[in-house]
């Protein structure tokens, strides 16, 4: 309920307006039926005056105008609440612990957020707010006006409520099982869809699409079949309800004919008021069934929102030192049962150019993620400048660090946005940075220039172009520590050599840490650190290692081949 309360508080003014209008409209709908009784009886006994007709007309006018005005807060809340739940998910991603984030599959996460946002909107808006402002007032006013006409009919209403309650609980048992199956099938369907969209080349070349499409179709059939069953159960309830109300209407007519106690106006009013009294019950039962079913989706969404946050993003000390100086002592890191870094010690001086080299799985990228505060180490010490990493506010650290991963960190937006985000930078400066990374031709050949959209994950660019665009971002970042995790892996050798020469010239006063598999690209670095099985097994310059370290020579020879 925490997140629902948060959204209620955010929209409290419109919630109060929405509830107030709903109660007023519920009263007017029933008062209209009650006053209509007087109009009918006045016509029957010829006592109806012009004032009575005018009053009834005024009641209708007010009722219809207020119903029209009611649409504004209704739609504002309906759409706003749904999008507020989606915003909660984005805020969660901005603070979620990195290890928790790694466990989530993109397809399942997208579906969980979509289902959860819809379910959250339904729980809060369609069930609670509608019940409070529409259903309960309408039922209450209807019963009051029915009681004014005939008390005995009121007692029959209560018996009918009990009957409908029993029917609803029987139907709910079937619906719960079906809804759970639908949720699982929808997440599975979305998993296959996103996987197919994202890995098009892999599946096409391996001829896996027929198998993927078959599995997706099976999930689709399960969803369609289950939703049809749910709809039939819903419609069964409405059919039973319609038959019950019909029986009540006939009963009213029979009661009036037999007892002669009701006027024509009273009979007309009772039939209208019974409709007002029972329609909310039908709606409430459908909403209640949906509410119970939506709670399953919302629970999954809440579980995601409740995942552990990285509290160090906001907590911790502000940095008062240069983070380009790094001291690591006896560092160990274990993920589940696997020890990835084992008793590692390393010192890096301010402005030094360091390369991490080693086999896949040797701990290089893990150490980078520890230095960025993404992974929390089990034991040891990591000091940036003269401050312990665990005590630093990470948001403060990220102002001083630039990080480029192997998966080029470009996003769906324009070239300009990918270069400078929202910074105010002249076009001349941006073009200059692109020239340094040999991307001038990219802008020159595009009609929109810097405002060209590059597509999701930069799909309009080649792998090398994406990496160069990300590297050009370094020209506009005032960082003390630059980390390059195979940031040039998609470039050809000549382009890589020229681009890295420009980058290293630009970063000459900054500490640079690079992970590289193409060892020629780091030949000019001050020091190369060799990793194997989570330990440092050697270090030195390129020339020193090439002539004295057999492990480095093996890596180099494998790279050359």
State each model region's role.
Residues 27-37, 129-172, 228-271:
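A hydrophobic transmembrane-helix motif
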Residues 15-69, 73, 147-154, 264:
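Transmembrane helix-loop-helix hairpins at lipid-water interfaces of multipass membrane proteins
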Residues 321-561:
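ABC-type nucleotide-binding domain
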Residues 1-10, 109:
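A short amphipathic helical element positioned immediately N-terminal to and/or at the very start
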Residues 58-62, 193, 267-287:
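Hydrophobic transmembrane alpha-helices
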Residues 208, 232, 276-306:
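Cytosolic ends of transmembrane helices, especially the final helix of ABC transmembrane type-1 domains
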Residues 73, 79, 87-117, 192-215, ...:
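Short intracellular "coupling" helices and adjacent cytoplasmic loop segments at the cytosolic face
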Residues 98-99, 115-128, 132, 136, ...:
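An intracellular "coupling" helix at the cytosolic face of ABC transporter transmembrane type-1 domains
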């Amino acid at each position: 309920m925490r997140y629902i309360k948060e959204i209620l508080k955010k929209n409290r003014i419109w919630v109060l307006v929405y509830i107030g209008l709903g109660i007023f409209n519920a009263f007017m709908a029933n008062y209209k039926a009650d006053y209509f009784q007087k109009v009918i009886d006045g016509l029957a006994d010829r006592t109806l005056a012009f004032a009575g007709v005018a009053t009834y007309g005024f009641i209708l006018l007010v009722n219809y105008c207020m119903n029209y005005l009611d649409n504004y807060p209704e739609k504002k809340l309906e759409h706003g609440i749904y999008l507020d739940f989606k915003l909660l998910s984005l805020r969660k991603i901005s603070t979620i612990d990195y290890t928790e984030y790694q466990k989530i599959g993109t397809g399942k996460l997208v579906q969980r957020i979509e289902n959860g946002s819809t379910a959250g909107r339904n729980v809060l808006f369609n069930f609670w707010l509608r019940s409070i402002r529409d259903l309960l007032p309408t039922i209450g006013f209807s019963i009051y006006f029915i009681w004014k006409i005939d008390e005995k009919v009121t007692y029959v209403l209560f018996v009918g409520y009990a009957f409908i309650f029993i029917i609803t609980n029987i139907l709910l048992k079937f619906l719960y099982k079906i809804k759970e199956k639908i949720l699982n099938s929808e997440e599975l369907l979305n998993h296959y869809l996103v996987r197919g969209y994202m890995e098009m080349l892999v599946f096409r070349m391996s001829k896996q699409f027929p198998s993927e499409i078959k599995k997706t179709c099976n999930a689709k059939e399960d969803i369609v079949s289950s939703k049809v069953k749910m709809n039939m159960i819903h419609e069964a309830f409405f059919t039973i309800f319609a038959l019950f109300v019909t029986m009540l209407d006939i009963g009213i007519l029979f009661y009036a004919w037999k007892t002669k106690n009701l006027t024509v106006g009273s009979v007309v009013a009772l039939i209208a008021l019974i409709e007002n009294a029972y329609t909310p019950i039908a709606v409430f039962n459908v909403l209640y069934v949906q509410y119970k079913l939506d709670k399953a989706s919302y629970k999954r969404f809440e579980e995601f929102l409740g995942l552990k946050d990285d509290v160090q993003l906001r907590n911790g000390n502000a940095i008062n030192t240069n983070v380009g100086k790094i001291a690591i002592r006896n560092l160990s890191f274990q993920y589940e049962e696997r020890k990835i870094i084992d008793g590692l010690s390393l010192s890096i001086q301010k402005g030094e150019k360091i390369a991490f080299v080693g086999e896949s799985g040797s701990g290089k990228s893990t150490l980078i993620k520890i230095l960025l505060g993404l992974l929390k180490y089990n034991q040891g010490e990591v000091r940036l400048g003269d401050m312990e990493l665990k005590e630093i506010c990470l948001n403060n650290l990220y102002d001083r660090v630039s990080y480029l991963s192997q998966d080029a960190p470009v996003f769906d937006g324009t070239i300009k946005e990918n270069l400078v985000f929202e910074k105010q930078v002249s076009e001349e400066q941006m073009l200059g940075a692109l020239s340094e990374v040999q991307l001038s031709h990219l802008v020159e050949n595009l009609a929109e220039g810097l405002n060209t959209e590059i597509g999701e994950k930069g799909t309009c660019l080649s792998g090398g172009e994406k990496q160069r665009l990300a590297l050009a971002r370094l020209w506009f970042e005032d960082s003390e520590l630059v980390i390059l995790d195979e940031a040039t892996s998609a470039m050809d050798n000549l382009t890589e050599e020229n681009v890295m020469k420009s980058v290293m010239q630009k970063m000459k006063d900054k500490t640079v840490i690079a992970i590289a598999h193409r060892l020629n690209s780091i030949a000019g670095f001050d020091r190369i650190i060799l990793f194997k099985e989570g330990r440092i097994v050697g270090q030195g310059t390129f020339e020193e290692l090439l002539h004295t370290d057999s492990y480095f020579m093996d890596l180099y020879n494998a790279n050359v081949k």
